[in-house]
């Protein structure tokens, strides 16, 4: 198969040769490897890459992936990172408009206003920048003679991949991992990896989030050596019994192994003090080319997990051969909790759930959405310090470590799928869905269901996740209904959230478990709750903290005491989106917002809505948050 640039124009092509999404677990050959600072089965490709920038597809270096290609004219770029912040293209902030507004006329393929000219919409566009990356590497000795995969944790927005001159695959969905099998093409030494990243494809219609419009390889790139016997996917499902002191844990596994290989799975569960509290094992059975099995065992005494006491247990899955030899070990921390809805009220471990939350974009004043671990931990510390107990990952999945930090800190998570098509149905503030996507368009359906699938499969084991969110401001329709159906079929005990059923009440029963609104006034919340409400109420966005804001928070908080079905909400938002740059006159570092980069179209200072500045200094509004949220700890 050869790469086809026309895939950029086709919403039905969004993954080619990409491996199925799976759990985000780590794996090791033995317990000794778990103690090492670096996993010998992993090799990072982060660092300096060769790079060329092109203004569009036609100007790209077409054969740059060939092994004998002369890349002496290429520049150098650091991965992970945004291409714009490396000095290429234009830095641009937009809220709901698309980057092509005012320049080119685009409507989503197959929408009511489509022109029939979508065949070259992005592949032949005058403006659709391309980044061509080359990385040369040798395999580390520990990884040789094994199957090799590569994982791109985040690439905006569409990527083509080659290794040693051979086409490997294609992927969209900027914010979930894209994984490919390199085994047929890789060598021990002298490998040439080539990645071509396109700023826009049909995926752009689904990624119209309120943020700076960057592109490039902005999250980690890792080679993974896969043992002969390997846990491909694991689903931990710990449950807390009604007595709140005992529980069960189910572990569903899918394992790859040589044909005829006998493999057993052993579960060991330990508490925080490293005392063993449960153990069980099964022999895996062959099914559809894989080994599968489910361990289901009682845990006699457990401590419940919640925001007040985020108690985690250490689970270890050992894969063993017929002689008992350990072939692979998978560690994972899990918590026991019970989430339920009784008489239209949500309860966690038998107590009514109250959300004192924030929306949080991933952001660094220096590196944009390519954030570091120390910035994530600083955000967690800030939330704990200011009585924030929940976060909505607006409006895309975050980096994998964030979910582990939330598990550990007891921060409840609304895990949002990477979807927003705001600009297709709202124009100049008016709702006009004639060219909305995905809506009920069959050709877009699998693309958005795949995004839901990637979100669920990657993060399903995280105790902190209480809600799955179908996305943000993408109107309603059969395609979004199909996303909800996917989550419901998983029966994982979590609730599904989506706000835009408010726009089309024909779907209110089939795309959200909660009545969710943005910026509803307190009296509007009361009107709903006083008139035979069908569902519990959440404000997925409220208290828009732009400028001198947050003065009305106390009025909303009173609703928590007045109405059991009101569960609180998520402030918009946690952190300003602004970039540190040197002032042209003083030479000092200053924060610059939308519109400060001569970017048009732009929504200007609308990028600054945080309760912390982009450098993570708390704003005065945080005092209101700390006080009122603290009343409900």
Q: Residue ranges of each PLM-predicted region?
A:
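Surface beta-strand/loop "capping" patches
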Residues: 228-258, 624-633
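Accessory beta-strand-rich segments of carbohydrate-active enzymes
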Residues: 3-16, 20-21, 35-36, 50-54, ...
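Active-site-adjacent substrate/metal-binding segments within catalytic domains
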Residues: 81-139, 143-151, 157-162, 169, ...
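Short glycine/proline/serine/threonine-rich loop/turn segments at secondary-structure transition edges
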Residues: 143-146, 186-190, 299-314
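Active-site region of glycoside hydrolase catalytic domains
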Residues: 232-240, 247-250, 328, 382-385, ...
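Accessory carbohydrate-binding/adhesion or oligomerization-edge regions at the termini
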Residues: 1-111, 192, 196, 272, ...
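Beta-strand-rich binding/interaction modules
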Residues: 161-163, 246-284, 293
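Substrate-binding clefts and catalytic carboxylate motifs of secreted carbohydrate-active enzymes
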Residues: 37-61, 78, 83-86, 128, ...
């Amino acid at each position: 198969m050869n790469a086809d640039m026309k895939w950029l124009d086709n919403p039905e092509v969004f993954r080619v040769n990409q491996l199925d999404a799976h759990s985000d677990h780590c794996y090791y050959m033995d317990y000794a490897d778990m103690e090492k600072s670096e996993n010998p089965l992993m090799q990072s490709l982060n660092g300096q890459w060769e790079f060329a920038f092109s203004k569009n597809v036609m100007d790209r270096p077409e054969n740059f992936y060939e092994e004998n290609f002369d890349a002496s004219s290429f520049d150098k770029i650091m991965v992970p990172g945004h291409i714009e912040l490396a000095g290429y293209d234009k830095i641009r902030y937009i809220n709901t408009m698309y980057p092509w507004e005012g320049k080119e006329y685009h409507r989503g393929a197959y929408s009511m206003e489509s022109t029939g000219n979508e065949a070259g919409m992005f592949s032949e566009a005058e403006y659709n920048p391309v980044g061509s990356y080359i990385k040369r590497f040798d395999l580390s000795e520990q990884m040789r003679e094994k199957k090799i995969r590569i994982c791109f944790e985040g690439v905006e927005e569409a990527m083509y991949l080659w290794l040693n001159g051979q086409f490997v695959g294609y992927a969209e969905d900027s914010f979930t991992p894209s994984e490919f099998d390199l085994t047929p093409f890789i060598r021990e030494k002298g490998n040439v990896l080539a990645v071509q990243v396109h700023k826009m494809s049909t995926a752009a219609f689904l990624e119209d989030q309120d943020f700076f419009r960057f592109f490039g390889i902005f999250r980690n790139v890792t080679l993974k050596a896969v043992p002969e016997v390997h846990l491909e996917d694991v689903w931990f499902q710990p449950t807390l019994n009604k007595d709140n002191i005992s529980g069960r844990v189910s572990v569903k596994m899918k394992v790859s192994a040589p044909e005829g290989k006998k493999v057993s799975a052993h579960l060991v569960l330990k508490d925080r003090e490293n005392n063993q509290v449960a153990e069980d094992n099964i022999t895996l059975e062959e099914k559809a080319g894989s080994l599968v099995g489910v361990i289901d065992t009682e845990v006699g005494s457990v401590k419940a997990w919640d925001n007040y006491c985020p108690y985690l247990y250490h689970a270890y899955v050992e894969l063993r051969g017929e002689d008992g030899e350990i072939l692979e070990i998978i560690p994972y921390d899990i918590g026991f909790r019970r989430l339920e809805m009784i008489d239209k009220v949500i309860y966690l471990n038998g107590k009514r759930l109250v959300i004192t939350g924030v929306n949080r974009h991933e952001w660094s004043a220096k590196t944009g959405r390519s954030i570091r671990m120390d910035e994530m931990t600083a955000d967690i510390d800030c939330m704990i310090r200011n009585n924030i107990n929940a976060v909505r990952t607006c409006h895309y999945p975050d980096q994998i470590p964030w979910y582990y930090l939330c598990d550990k800190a007891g921060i409840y998570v609304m895990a949002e799928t990477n979807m927003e098509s705001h600009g297709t149905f709202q124009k100049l503030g008016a709702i006009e869905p004639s060219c909305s996507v995905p809506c009920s368009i069959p050709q877009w359906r699998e693309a958005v269901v795949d995004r839901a699938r990637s979100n669920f499969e990657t993060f399903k084991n995280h105790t902190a996740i209480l809600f799955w969110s179908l996305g943000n401001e993408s109107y309603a329709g059969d395609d979004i209904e199909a996303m909800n159906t996917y989550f419901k079929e998983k029966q994982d005990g979590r609730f599904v959230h989506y706000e835009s059923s408010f726009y089309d009440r024909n779907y209110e029963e089939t795309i959200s478990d909660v009545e969710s609104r943005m910026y509803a006034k307190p009296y509007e919340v009361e009107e709903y709750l006083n008139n035979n409400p069908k569902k519990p109420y959440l404000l997925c966005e409220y208290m828009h903290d732009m400028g001198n804001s947050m003065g009305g928070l106390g009025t909303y908080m009173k609703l928590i005491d007045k109405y059991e079905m009101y569960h609180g909400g998520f402030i918009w938002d946690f952190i300003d989106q602004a970039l540190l740059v040197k002032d042209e006159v003083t030479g000092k570092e200053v924060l610059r917002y939308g519109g400060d980069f001569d970017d048009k179209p732009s929504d200007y200072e609308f990028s600054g809505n945080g309760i912390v500045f982009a450098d993570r200094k708390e704003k005065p509004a945080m005092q209101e948050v700390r006080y009122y949220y603290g009343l409900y700890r």
